[in-house]
Amino acid sequence: MTDGVILVFARAPEAGQAKTRLIPKLGPEGAAQLHSRLVHLTLDTATAFHNVSVQLWCSPDPHRSFFSQCRATYEVELHAQSGVDLGERMLNAFNQALTDYDWALLIGTDCPDLNIEDFEQAEQDLNNGIDVVLGPAADGGYYLIGLKRPEPNLFQNIPWGGSEVLSCTYTRLNEAGLTFSQLHEHHDIDRPEDLIRFPRLSDADVT
């Protein structure tokens, strides 16, 4: 058994399907291009973390040419997301990964400020006996969740995509008596106003 694995959840950057809340500002093609840049940035960071396997969990499926290119560039494993909602897809990924690894960190591709120090702190906390590590996002969600064993209650009946995801997750953690730690808060890119914080990632005039 290898020590740990990073699970990167990503959607194919298809115009009209990716970063839809940014389409009014960037247009379908521009939003898809930004999403592609975010996926590559995330994989750059994840694969730079020391001696940890990286799996790219793909939506709608891993057979898109974009994901094949990612596999060739980053030497990541490709997996298909499966489940009726985000929570079920995340839980299924953890269930599979934690049969082969001691711990797993699951991340999306919306957080440009995610860094190696976040991964190092999460790994340290899990190895020191913490049950769950969360990376809080400023919008009320989280950009990272780390586990040593699947915890179904953390992924069921959560209002995914809203501002209550993190608070609901903390409630579930407390109800289950799980120990948890929190990483530094970061901002996601989800809405046009978020682009102002990350001008290097978009050619759009956001001022």
Task: Label the model's feature ranges.
Residues 163, 167-207:
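Conserved alpha/beta core of the MobA/IspD/sugar-nucleotide pyrophosphorylase nucleotidyltransferase superfamily
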Residues 68-103, 162-165:
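Short phosphate-binding loop-to-helix
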Residues 114-139:
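Conserved donor-nucleotide/metal-binding helix-loop-beta segment in metal-dependent transferases, i.e.
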Residues 33-52:
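A short, N-terminal amphipathic alpha-helix
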Residues 105-107:
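Short aromatic-hydrophobic micro-motifs that form the base-stacking/packing surface
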Residues 1-22:
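N-terminal nucleotide-binding beta1-loop-alpha1 segment
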Residues 52-60:
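Short beta-strand/loop segment that forms part of the nucleotide-sugar
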Residues 14-20, 64-67, 142-144:
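Short acidic/His/Gly/Ser-rich catalytic and metal-binding motifs that mark active-site loops
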